[in-house]
Curated annotation (Swiss-Prot):
Binds 2 heme b groups non-covalently. It holds the Pfam family Cytochrome_B. This is Cytochrome b. GO terms for biological process: mitochondrial electron transport, ubiquinol to cytochrome c. The lineage of its organism: Eukaryota, Metazoa, Chordata, Craniata, Vertebrata. Heme b b566 binds at residues 89, 188. A ubiquinone binds at residue 193. One of its GO terms (molecular function) is ubiquinol-cytochrome-c reductase activity. Belongs to the cytochrome b family. GO terms for cellular component: mitochondrial inner membrane; respiratory chain complex III. It is a multi-pass membrane protein. It comes from Heterodon simus. Its cofactor is heme b. The gene is MT-CYB.
Length: 372
């Protein structure tokens, strides 16, 4: 009987009539989480968290374990798909003013930070050249913290350099964090259903709602099928498209790669870090590049929630998206002109969005009041 009530609640869940495809990325992210947790579990069964055996254990998984290559490729490519979905999900939130639902936005930003930490720890696990050196560069940023820096770094490493204890604890963290992501996701969804989704018009949806099933279930299924098709095509035909060639060599502390860079989904933050010549300043800018999202609900000044009817805000938004892509591209290049200049100017533009947007909202209100 209780099952019937659960089904009824799910079937009759009222959802806004006019939410577009951009609202499908939440369910896609949930699918990515399930996929990553499942494949990650099977990889963890065969993985060995030891600096002498980690690289070999990955080779063993891809060569000797039945269907190990599928597990490994789906897990690696799935991470990229996860980030593509989450960046679109955040962009949707910024464009349509979803951030005005403060609790949902704050829990979402927490999820993003946790996801980035999980992905970073996971990138270190294969113990390839880029894994080792990316870990060295990023963990070294802790030394920029005044007074406590060196102590924190030594504590995180479990010694005076990145070594076996570091890999062991990174594996432990990479294993536990997805469960924190799952529980935070449940809180995120619960908070969302307190108020309900926004919609492309930015208006209240209460006057016109439809049942979640069958309308939105089929809509979600279509996008999930598209996501999985893209994932399987990439995994089958271009399995190493997101991998760094350096990572196919075992970690060697004596040889530094010519150009150390993290995975593509961290490049925007890495580009901002790299564009500031001061270590502490760069570290603060790196943290702020993500934490600044938290300011969005508190700096919204426009009387209109969504950017659908705000042409100037749309120009600003798409400039921000282009800036994001440009930082990502510039961060893949060596530290030399003109890339240093591009990195610096795009970093300034990136942060400018969060300053100009409230000013633009304020000026729009002035114009509307004048015409009234």
């Amino acid at each position: 009987m209780s099952n019937q009530h659960t089904l009824l609640m799910f079937n009759l869940l009222p959802v806004g009539l006019n939410i577009s495809t951009w609202w499908n990325f939440g369910s896609m992210l949930l699918t990515c989480t399930a996929l990553q947790t499942t494949t990650g579990f099977f990889l963890a069964i065969h993985y060995t968290a030891n600096i002498n055996l980690a690289f070999t254990s990955i080779v063993h998984i891809t060569r000797d374990v039945p269907y190990g290559w599928i597990m490994q490729n789906i897990h690696a490519t799935g991470a990229s798909m996860f980030f593509i979905c989450i960046y679109i999900h955040i962009a949707r939130g910024l464009y349509y003013g979803s951030y005005l639902n403060k609790e949902v936005w704050v829990s979402g930003t927490t999820l993003l930070v946790t996801l980035m930490a999980t992905a970073f720890f996971g990138y270190v696990l294969p113990w390839g050249q880029m894994s080792f050196w990316a870990a060295t560069v990023i963990t070294n940023l802790l030394t920029a913290v005044p007074y406590l820096g060196s102590t924190l770094t030594t504590w995180l490493w479990g010694g005076f350099s990145i070594n076996d204890p570091t890999l062991t604890r990174f594996f432990a963290l990479h294993f536990i964090l997805p469960f924190i992501i799952i529980s935070t996701s449940l809180i995120h969804v619960m908070l969302l259903h307190n108020e309900g989704s926004s919609n492309p018009l930015g208006t209240n949806s209460d006057i016109d709602k439809i049942p979640f099933h069958p309308y939105h279930t089929y809509k979600d299924t279509l996008m999930l099928t598209t996501l999985l098709t893209l994932l399987f095509i990439t995994t089958s035909f271009f399995p190493n498209i997101f991998n760094d060639p350096e990572n196919f060599s075992k970690a060697n502390p004596l040889i530094t790669p010519q150009h150390i860079k993290p995975e593509w989904y961290f490049l925007f933050a890495y580009g901002i870090l790299r564009s500031i010549p001061n270590k502490l300043g760069g570290t603060m800018a790196l943290v702020m590049s993500i934490i600044i999202l938290l300011t969005a609900p508190f700096t919204h000044t426009s009387h209109v929630r969504s950017m659908t009817f705000r042409p100037m805000a749309q120009v600003l938004f798409w400039t921000f998206i282009a800036t994001f892509m440009l930082i990502t591209w510039a961060a893949t290049k060596p530290v030399e002109p003109p890339f240093t200049t591009i990195g610096l100017s795009t970093s300034i533009l990136y942060f400018s969005f969060f300053i100009i947007n409230p000013l633009l909202g304020w000026s729009e209100n002035k114009i509307m009041n004048t015409h009234n």
